[in-house]
Amino acid sequence: SANDVALQIAEQIGGSVDGFVQMMNNRAVELGCTNTVFTNPTGLPDDNQHTTAHDMALIMQAAIQNESFRTIAAATSYTIPATNKAAARNLTSKFTMTDTGSTGFYEGCIGGKEGYTEASGSTLVCAAQRNGMTLISVVLKGASGQTAPDAASILNYGFDQFVTLSLGDSDFSIISGGDVVVPAGTGADSLTTEDSQNGDQIDRTYLFNGTSVGSAVLEVVQSD
């Protein structure tokens, strides 16, 4: 898992491994992770380090907003250019769900990470996109060789049971957002909204049965 690289990145960005770990924990809090504590950047076992499937999903949700991350996560191979010390070297990704030659290949998978330690068991976090909807799957404490099929089952359930609605309003112009994920067969008339004024704009939250399913920033349309 290139943990040597993880440590080098930590020192480069955080000034030290401990400094980077503090940055990791601060960012986790910003993302809404309430049950995560990092003690190292490698993921190797530590009695004081822990997380949950929900928190891992929040972290993955933030990660895939970064285009550079998506490009790297989706890459199946990379060539390290030659230097005056070594010839070019080819690296091949071993991530099952983006490997077209693997039985675990999943159409639409953006990327992800598999892992294993005795303490955590087999784990897998991934994201996939189909028909304009992106879903995240997290498998923790899985059985050996079973995490990719389990992740695929979770994603299949999501894509089969939920749809994305793009909402509009004749009285408002949507500046950002406006897409919601709801159970299949649900119409816009099943949603309720909560609005808050933010200067000249309106921050709108869409709810389904009291649960937030999306948001939008709106601007009032001025009539002639």
Spans of model-derived segments:
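Domain-terminus/edge residues, biased toward the C-terminal soluble/receptor-binding domains
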Residues: 33-34, 47-224
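Active-site-adjacent loops and short helices of periplasmic peptidoglycan-processing enzymes
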Residues: 1-54, 58-67, 130
